[in-house]
Amino acid sequence: MSASVRGNSKNPQSTSAITTLTDKLLEDISGDFETLQKQFSEKLETMSTRLDQLEESMREAMNKKSSVSPVTSTE
């Protein structure tokens, strides 16, 4: 492995630049992860709300169906 790849103390500017770049990349990845986490949570909350609404409408439909009396013939 060459000295520049190992990042030895002969070139501290190179080591500092790599450290700075690595820190920046980690910050970017962390920020992206937080954004994705927020988006996922928002989508999950939206789906939960929609499922609650669907359950309620199904419950109402079942109640209406059970409250309608069957039509009987008088023949």
Curated annotation (Swiss-Prot):
Pfam families the UniProt entry points to: HSBP1
Q: Name one GO cellular component term.
A: nucleus
Q: Which GO terms describe its molecular function?
A: transcription corepressor activity
Q: Which GO terms describe its biological process?
A: cellular heat acclimation
Family the entry assigns:
Belongs to the HSBP1 family.
Task: Tell me the protein's name.
Answer: Uncharacterized protein C16E9.15
